[in-house]
Amino acid sequence: MSVIESIRGVLWARRHRPDQVAIVMGASHERFAPQELLRQAVLAEEAGFDAVACSDHLTPWWVPGGLAPAHCGNAWVWLGAASQATGAIGLGTGVTGVIHRYNPVVVAQQVATLEALAPGRTFLGVGSSEAMNEVPAGMRWPDTAEQLQRTAEALEIIVRLLDGETVDFRGVYFTTTGARLYDRPARRPPVIVSAFHEQIAEVAGQLADGLWTLGSPTIAPKVIAAYRRGAEKAGREPGEIWLQALAATGADDDEALAGSREWKPALVQELYTHDIHSTGDIQAKGEDVSDGQFTRANLVSADPGSHVAKLRLLSELGATGIVVVNASGADPEGLIRLYGRDVLPRLREG
């Protein structure tokens, strides 16, 4: 079985038609405590989501105790618990940074272990992280060129280890000596790369099994095209294309917006590339995002029809999977129930 077939085995298990788009719930460690997120994962499986992708952050997007509660449980410890609390839903990170804080050998070991605990259900989302997650851990935040090279080196190591190689690697930033996975699962977890810019998207096409980017009509087409170019250059079939948006609901649209405003910094591109790492500075950057910009870019509405319409627009951009990040602070479990009752069935009926 190819890696692409293996990921489709995870995400297409509930498909009524093979062309349906996978809907993945984003579980937000920054906003919800670990036990609460476990409850959300169980509810997501019951509601009919195809997978759960949990964030992997050390620092939240806002000042603790300000706009919203702030948490940041460890993604990999939580995924181990989620693998035992759920039975069939896909599980993985959305996404793990691989430039500093995590060594790529350890990342490969972590996802291989998760696959052993949840056979046939796992995937690995990786990216270059943000300064907020690296600088507090004592790491130097690199410029964009170094971020790109670090990510490419880490990605090569991870993929080779998951493919069963013993890896001797001498890169500019990473080195391995006889590294291997001693508990390598029978099925190789697919690796999906987060990319907001064309250069890393092209690397993803050359080395990885899928692309993960923002569901923006101005960003997604260029990034997707670069990903496909990279795959073509490497003589590979393009894999999965996941588009991401935040989602929130409430008693009405005003409550949906009020319960998700803390997420505005996630729309600021500068936070993904520049050394901005304090929660105060991060939150301040989000203040430049208007309510209108925030709601247009995301799924923020009490009306399930609005969610369905926007998800269909994302599908038309070329998505094979859509990551719906649960940003519904007013009623996170209500968002999951809304999707299970009124959104997912309408999407899947055509």
Regions from the language model: what does each represent?
Residues M1-G350:
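Active-site-adjacent structural elements that line small-molecule/cofactor binding pockets in enzymes
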